[in-house]
Amino acid sequence: MTGPERAAPAVDPSVVVVDLSVVVPAYNEEQRLGPTLDAITAYLGDNEGRFGDWEIIVADDGSDDGTREVVTSRSLDNPRVQLVTSPRNRGKGNALRLGVAASRGRRVLVTDADLAAPIEELEKLDKELGEGRAAAIGSRAAPGATIESHQHPVRELLGRAGNFLIRKAAVPGIRDTQCGFKLFDGDRAREAFAASRINGWGIDVEVLQHFRRADWDVAEVPVRWSHQSGSKVRPLDYARVLTELARLRARSLRPVDVLVPLLFLLMSVALYSGRFFDPNHRYLEDSLQDQNQWEWFFAVTADNVAHLHNPFFSNLQGFPDGVNLMANTVMLGLSVPFAPLTLLAGPAVSLSVCMALGLAATAAAWYWLIVKRVVRQRAAAFVGASLAAFAPPMVSHANAHPNFVILFMIPLIIDRALRLCAGTRVVRDGVLLGLMAAYQIFLGEEPLLLASMGMVLFAASYGVLNRDVVRASWRPLLKGLGIAALVCAPIILIPLWYQFVGPQSYKSVLHGDNAGNSPLALLSFAERSLMAGDEIRANSLSLNPTEQNAFYGWPLVALAFAIVVRLWEHALVKALAFTAIAAAILSMGPKIRIPLTDTIYPGPWALLAHKPLFESVIEGRVAMICAPALGMLVALAVERLAATRELGTQYVGLLAVCLALLPLVPAPLKAVDRAAVPAFFTDGTYKSYVRAGESLVPLPLADPGAAEALHWQTAAHLGFKMPGGYFNGPYGADRIGIYGASPRYTSNMLRDVRYTGVLPTIGKNWQAQAKADFAYWHAGALVVAPQPNDDKLRTAVEKLVGKPGKWVDGVWVWDLHEGS
């Protein structure tokens, strides 16, 4: 779309305006400049009927060869050839500013001194400008371009990479910004170049950015191009262009768009403040045993990366059977990139940094999507994104589940799917969507499944309301999704095969009949609500503190209802409302119990509960879909209120928003001092008790209820293997997924002793069973650390082994090599 008509700037009456100015930047071009000037003057002289009066301005950038003399000699023969000079070499950008500022043309052609694009190509550019464009730029990458002589392959590769970065960071949609052959409307060119600040090669990008911001139409025109020897582009110039791109990108950002991510980071750090500043010695109490588990995941991934081991499997816990890491949420998409930090600072630091940054990045991604797709008002988008990322369910999972907190890819996937509906660049968008989906699978499969459910709910409702949109978008959408699947499949095929068929894979994980949300949970407040939290009530309405998947509070529900009623005429509002309501109902599970009654109704989740993939989902988590939907509804309301001129309406409306959101503001997550790791592990004493192929057996075995032994293992730099643990693995012939290792008689008995303090009668049968279990575990030594009922535990182990343990560096040890 062409920009609005602009009045021409005031022109000095003494200055003669010409039809075309040709600006040639030059630095030490003594050898190439003469033929270039001859070719241009000859062509323009032969085509004055088409191009009218013309001038050539050579902008010398402090050359120290005979460049100026070449221009001076041509000026004597043809006064239309002029020279402007810079006292010293400052770069192409400086030269172009000088040359364009000195121009008088209604149109300005900028061409490189090597004339790699022949002057005859001017006719193509002139035709585009004649159709109302503000600029026509020659392109080597546009369809129809001809490359008659290629650059060196390395230089060509660097150029393509540079153009890709430029498209992503500065001027999306333009394939080639660096072809030195561009025709501009004269007045607009002088304005854009005068506003430029870059002295280097990045000025082309800066000027095109100026045209974009001014909404001036730019056409990319395929041209003939031939590489010329003697290029002034040096290897370091590519690095300088990257620096200039970074400057342009930073300059194009609004201050608020820089401030908002910083605010999100501060909010995230505040939430994690109890652990963030000393992660090695602090523990998130409400994470139960998940912090131990996730630190182990990060540690074992880093170890696999460092030693080039299989990233999908480990036998460090669950020994000897091991753990299918791909079937557990190890988040290879982050635990692998964070491996250097894990190896350097330890898994506690790495996990803490990852979760704080990931939560902030997720909020920033929702902010970006809301600004791009929902509202333009930044404050409204900030409020909506804050709710989407810091809603009570997200805060609950922030205790323990980084895969449900670090969701920055979800807004990007949503945006890319919406681009497919537009149908403009289906192949490109399909490829990118496939890559994004593949990466999200390595961040978390269940969040991707839930996000897909939310997108389907939204698309279905929006499609019913906008049949024309469906008719226009279904073909490119299906084509793009097909391309995405073709791109994604080869990347994830082997990992998913390993997950579902590989060692220690399982069919599904059963969560019981109480995993759905009560309707009361949707209206109540979460435990960590700073102003309205009620620990007893929240725990009574949820599985545990890490699974408070609803708890939006009745004020927000009431506000959302009011927003939907007030803005009902908008299809977007209706679709968001349907998405939130449908997700809330699905989250109640296959059976919905009406509060305060014994009445139970079948829920729609029953249709999905036993389907593949869905059977392993904790259905209460479906309510997390409500968070971004509610965030967008609130953002729409805040934008509407900010724009109204009725102060009473604005005041009452914004007050209602504040009253609905303030009860949801979370208190920092609870953190406590971490129990010290016994010196037996940290000092390496354990090494003298465990031989190659053997395991060290902490008793009772680590399990989902007590996984401190995983912390001991990471503190010992994964120096020993152990049975038991906290992971998802198979059980029985049906390979049903369970939490922890398959139970054995000895481990079950010792666990009962630990929790009840009741010691069973231990005779020859128990001793024989223990001997078989120790052999199965390849046990080299048994360890009992100080813990509740440890005296009863020691007695039980002594009777099983037939000898007392030894107190060694903070633990009791039974060396099974000593004839037991």
Stretches with model-predicted labels:
Residues 86-102, 107-110, 119-201, 227-236:
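Acceptor/aglycone-binding surface of glycosyltransferases and processive sugar-polymer synthases
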Residues 288-304, 477-480, 484-564, 606, ...:
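Periplasmic/ER-lumenal interhelical loops and adjacent helix-loop junctions
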